[in-house]
C-alpha cells in the first residue's frame, strides 16, 4: 500500500507540473504553435492577475519547445548521407514569396536563437571569451549569401545527375509565387580569393571553393514533366588543401 500511495503522489505532482505546458498549448493553438501569429486577450484576462508571471514562464517554455521541434524536424528530413555522398547538408533555403525576402531563412534565425539560449546559460566571463569578435577570429574563407530567383539559376542538377529546368513561379490557390533560393558562395571580391586565410603557404597550396547541397524545388525535366525534386545549389565556401611537393 505504501508503494502504491507513493506512486499515486508522484503521478499527481507530475501531472501538475505538466499542466501549464498543456494549457499553454491549448490556448496557443491559434498563435503559439508557430512564431509570428498573434492571439487575442492577455494572460491576466484568462487566469487572473496573479497568473501573469506563471503564464509568461510557460509561454517561454512553449516557444523554446516549438523551436527545438522545428530544428529536430529539419534533421529528420535531410537526405540519407550514405546513399547520397554529395548531399552533405539539407536546409530550408527555398522560399515561395511574391517579393524578395528581407531576412535569411527561418531555420537560420532559429539556429541563431538556439545558440543565444545556449549562450544565456554561460557565465558572463565565458560569454565574453567565447565571442569570436573579441578573440579576433576570422573566417578561413570569405563568403557571401543572397537570395536568387529561378530566373538567375535557369537550370540545376538533380539527385540523379540530370539537368532540370528550375521553374520561376509556383502556382498557388490565389495566383503565383516566385521561388527564391538562399545561396552561399565564396566571395570573388574577398581577401581569400588567392588562398585560404591562416594557411602556411610554404607547405600548403590552398583554395577557397564553393560547395553545393540539395534543396527541394519545383522543376521540369527534359520530358516536360513538372514536379518537386532535390536540386543542387551553392550553400557554403570551404578551404581545400594540397601539400606542396618537393618538401
Curated annotation (Swiss-Prot):
<dbReference type="GO" id="GO:1900122">
    <property type="term" value="P:positive regulation of receptor binding"/>
</dbReference>
<dbReference type="GO" id="GO:0005788">
    <property type="term" value="C:endoplasmic reticulum lumen"/>
</dbReference>
<feature type="disulfide bond">
    <location>
        <begin position="141"/>
        <end position="208"/>
    </location>
</feature>
<dbReference type="InterPro" id="IPR029034">
    <property type="entry name" value="Cystine-knot_cytokine"/>
</dbReference>
<dbReference type="GO" id="GO:0043524">
    <property type="term" value="P:negative regulation of neuron apoptotic process"/>
</dbReference>
<dbReference type="GO" id="GO:0048471">
    <property type="term" value="C:perinuclear region of cytoplasm"/>
</dbReference>
<comment type="function">
    <text>Important signaling molecule that activates signaling cascades downstream of NTRK2. During development, promotes the survival and differentiation of selected neuronal populations of the peripheral and central nervous systems. Participates in axonal growth, pathfinding and in the modulation of dendritic growth and morphology. Major regulator of synaptic transmission and plasticity at adult synapses in many regions of the CNS.</text>
</comment>
<dbReference type="GO" id="GO:0008021">
    <property type="term" value="C:synaptic vesicle"/>
</dbReference>
<keyword id="KW-0964">Secreted</keyword>
<dbReference type="GO" id="GO:0050804">
    <property type="term" value="P:modulation of chemical synaptic transmission"/>
</dbReference>
<dbReference type="GO" id="GO:0010976">
    <property type="term" value="P:positive regulation of neuron projection development"/>
</dbReference>
<comment type="similarity">
    <text>Belongs to the NGF-beta family.</text>
</comment>
<dbReference type="GO" id="GO:0007416">
    <property type="term" value="P:synapse assembly"/>
</dbReference>
<keyword id="KW-0325">Glycoprotein</keyword>
<dbReference type="InterPro" id="IPR019846">
    <property type="entry name" value="Nerve_growth_factor_CS"/>
</dbReference>
<feature type="site" description="Cleavage; by MBTPS1">
    <location>
        <begin position="57"/>
        <end position="58"/>
    </location>
</feature>
<keyword id="KW-0732">Signal</keyword>
<dbReference type="GO" id="GO:0005576">
    <property type="term" value="C:extracellular region"/>
</dbReference>
<dbReference type="GO" id="GO:2000008">
    <property type="term" value="P:regulation of protein localization to cell surface"/>
</dbReference>
<dbReference type="GO" id="GO:0048668">
    <property type="term" value="P:collateral sprouting"/>
</dbReference>
<feature type="glycosylation site" description="N-linked (GlcNAc...) asparagine">
    <location>
        <position position="121"/>
    </location>
</feature>
<dbReference type="GO" id="GO:0048672">
    <property type="term" value="P:positive regulation of collateral sprouting"/>
</dbReference>
<dbReference type="InterPro" id="IPR002072">
    <property type="entry name" value="Nerve_growth_factor-rel"/>
</dbReference>
<keyword id="KW-0339">Growth factor</keyword>
<dbReference type="GO" id="GO:0031550">
    <property type="term" value="P:positive regulation of brain-derived neurotrophic factor receptor signaling pathway"/>
</dbReference>
<dbReference type="InterPro" id="IPR020430">
    <property type="entry name" value="Brain-der_neurotrophic_factor"/>
</dbReference>
<comment type="subunit">
    <text>Monomers and homodimers. Binds to NTRK2/TRKB. Can form heterodimers with other neurotrophin family members, such as NTF3 and NTF4 (in vitro), but the physiological relevance of this is not clear. BDNF precursor form: interacts with the heterodimer formed by NGFR and SORCS2.</text>
</comment>
<dbReference type="GO" id="GO:0048812">
    <property type="term" value="P:neuron projection morphogenesis"/>
</dbReference>
<keyword id="KW-1015">Disulfide bond</keyword>
<feature type="disulfide bond">
    <location>
        <begin position="196"/>
        <end position="239"/>
    </location>
</feature>
<dbReference type="GO" id="GO:0008083">
    <property type="term" value="F:growth factor activity"/>
</dbReference>
<feature type="propeptide">
    <location>
        <begin position="19"/>
        <end position="128"/>
    </location>
</feature>
<dbReference type="GO" id="GO:0030424">
    <property type="term" value="C:axon"/>
</dbReference>
<dbReference type="GO" id="GO:0005163">
    <property type="term" value="F:nerve growth factor receptor binding"/>
</dbReference>
<keyword id="KW-0165">Cleavage on pair of basic residues</keyword>
<dbReference type="InterPro" id="IPR020408">
    <property type="entry name" value="Nerve_growth_factor-like"/>
</dbReference>
<dbReference type="GO" id="GO:0007399">
    <property type="term" value="P:nervous system development"/>
</dbReference>
<dbReference type="GO" id="GO:0021675">
    <property type="term" value="P:nerve development"/>
</dbReference>
<dbReference type="GO" id="GO:0007411">
    <property type="term" value="P:axon guidance"/>
</dbReference>
<dbReference type="GO" id="GO:0038180">
    <property type="term" value="P:nerve growth factor signaling pathway"/>
</dbReference>
<dbReference type="GO" id="GO:0030425">
    <property type="term" value="C:dendrite"/>
</dbReference>
<dbReference type="GO" id="GO:2001234">
    <property type="term" value="P:negative regulation of apoptotic signaling pathway"/>
</dbReference>
Amino acid at each position: 500500500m505504501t508503494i502504491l500511495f507513493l506512486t499515486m503522489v508522484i503521478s499527481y505532482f507530475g501531472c501538475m507540473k505538466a499542466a501549464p505546458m498543456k494549457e499553454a498549448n491549448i490556448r496557443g493553438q491559434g498563435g503559439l504553435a508557430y512564431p509570428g501569429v498573434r492571439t487575442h486577450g492577455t494572460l491576466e484576462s484568462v487566469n487572473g492577475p496573479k497568473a501573469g508571471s506563471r503564464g509568461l514562464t510557460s509561454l517561454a517554455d512553449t516557444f523554446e519547445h516549438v523551436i527545438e521541434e522545428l530544428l529536430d524536424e529539419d534533421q529528420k528530413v535531410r537526405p540519407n548521407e550514405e546513399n547520397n555522398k554529395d548531399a552533405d547538408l539539407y536546409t530550408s533555403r527555398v522560399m515561395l514569396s511574391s517579393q524578395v525576402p528581407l531576412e535569411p531563412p527561418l531555420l537560420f534565425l532559429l539556429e541563431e536563437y538556439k545558440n543565444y539560449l545556449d549562450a544565456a546559460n554561460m557565465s558572463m566571463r565565458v560569454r565574453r571569451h567565447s565571442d569570436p569578435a573579441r578573440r579576433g577570429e576570422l573566417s578561413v574563407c570569405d563568403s557571401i549569401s543572397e537570395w536568387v530567383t529561378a530566373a538567375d539559376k535557369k537550370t540545376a542538377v538533380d539527385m540523379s545527375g540530370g539537368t532540370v529546368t528550375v521553374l520561376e513561379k509556383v502556382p498557388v490557390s490565389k495566383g503565383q509565387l516566385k521561388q527564391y533560393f538562399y545561396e552561399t558562395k565564396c566571395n570573388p571580391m574577398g581577401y581569400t580569393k588567392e588562398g585560404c586565410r591562416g594557411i602556411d603557404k610554404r607547405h600548403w597550396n590552398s583554395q577557397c571553393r564553393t560547395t553545393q547541397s540539395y534543396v527541394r524545388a519545383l522543376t521540369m525535366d527534359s520530358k516536360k514533366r513538372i514536379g518537386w525534386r532535390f536540386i543542387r545549389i551553392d550553400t557554403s565556401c570551404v578551404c581545400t588543401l594540397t601539400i606542396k611537393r618537393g618538401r
